[in-house]
């Protein structure tokens, strides 16, 4: 993902919040990704570049967590882009409210060629020697939790209103307290190939106490048809993981004393 990666790293290095430890993990890529990472490291000493064999997203994230030394953890995918003040807004909210988790709305960016139809049209135009038209991009903002400070129980109740949403499920629109992750040995299960972000977040939910929602979207999630989540699909694994997710929801909400209150009614 050389083109996407350069744009992503540039947006991270350009954050107005400067006290960053930027851990970049190259999970056995065979393109120019490692060279691009090294170019950025040469310009910015905050970068820690790790070149490792291909082990998958969960083991790669665990390697990053093991290296991290800051007070807070923030995730980013190499396809995506951060607004300059995104990290500043997250950290400011965390410090102001002594938050264990900060969550923000995000922008979903859908290039026209990210759909099957758009990609097929672009391929046809190229085969006919026709210059493809500039992609018409769709942008949508997503966020469900009103601005404010929430207890664990209130956050859990809100989550169950949109349990399948990216907003609650993904990593990259949140800021996590590293101490909670380390003390409770939280991480990503290598054998899980669907909703691994959500499983991590459910584990984190049990140990965090103060949750803060901010109103400003600063993360641009860009749908890329060539990304790992679109090209490496294990349908059997997904079915098995869905069963795990449903069971985990029940177990977590039972331990929180909320299962009877929130379980579906006949």
Residue ranges and their predicted role:
Residues 12, 27-28, 55, 78:
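Conserved short acidic donor-positioning loop in nucleotide-sugar-dependent glycosyltransferases
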Residues 26-35:
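A conserved acidic beta->alpha catalytic loop
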Residues 52-68:
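Glycine-rich, basic loop-to-helix element that forms the pyrophosphate-binding segment
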Residues 81-214, 219-237:
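Donor-binding/catalytic cores of nucleotide-activated saccharide
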Residues 240-265:
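C-terminal, non-catalytic tails of nucleotide-sugar-dependent glycosyltransferases
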Residues 1-14:
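Short, well-formed alpha-helical segments that are part of the catalytic scaffolds
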Residues 11, 21, 199:
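Cell-envelope/extracellular polymer assembly enzymes that use nucleotide-activated donors
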Residues 73:
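Short aromatic/hydrophobic "clamp" motif used to bind/position activated sugar donors
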């Amino acid at each position: 993902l050389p083109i996407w990666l350069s744009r992503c790293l540039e947006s991270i290095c350009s954050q107005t919040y400067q006290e960053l430890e930027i851990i970049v993990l190259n999970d056995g890529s065979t393109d120019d990704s490692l060279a691009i990472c090294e170019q950025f490291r040469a310009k910015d000493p905050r970068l820690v570049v790790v070149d490792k064999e291909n082990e998958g997203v969960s083991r790669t994230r665990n390697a990053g967590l093991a290296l991290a030394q800051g007070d807070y953890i923030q995730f980013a995918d190499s396809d995506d882009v951060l607004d300059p003040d995104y990290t500043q807004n997250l950290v400011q909210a965390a410090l102001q409210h002594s938050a264990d988790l900060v969550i923000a709305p995000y922008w979903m960016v859908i290039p026209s060629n990210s759909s099957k139809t758009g990609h097929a049209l672009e391929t046809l135009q190229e085969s006919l020697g026709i210059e493809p038209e500039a992609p018409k991009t769709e942008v949508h903002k997503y966020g469900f939790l009103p601005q404010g400070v929430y207890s664990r129980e209130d956050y859990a109740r809100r989550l169950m209103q949109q349990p399948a949403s990216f907003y609650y499920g993904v990593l990259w629109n949140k800021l996590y307290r590293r101490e909670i992750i380390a003390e409770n040995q939280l991480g990503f299960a290598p054998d899980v190939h669907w909703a691994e972000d959500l499983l991590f977040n459910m584990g984190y939910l049990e140990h965090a106490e103060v949750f803060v929602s901010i109103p400003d979207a600063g993360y641009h999630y860009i749908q890329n048809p060539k990304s790992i989540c679109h090209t490496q699909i294990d349908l059997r694994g997904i079915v098995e993981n869905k069963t795990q997710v449903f069971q985990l929801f029940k177990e977590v909400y039972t331990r929180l004393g909320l299962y009877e209150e929130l379980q579906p009614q006949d």
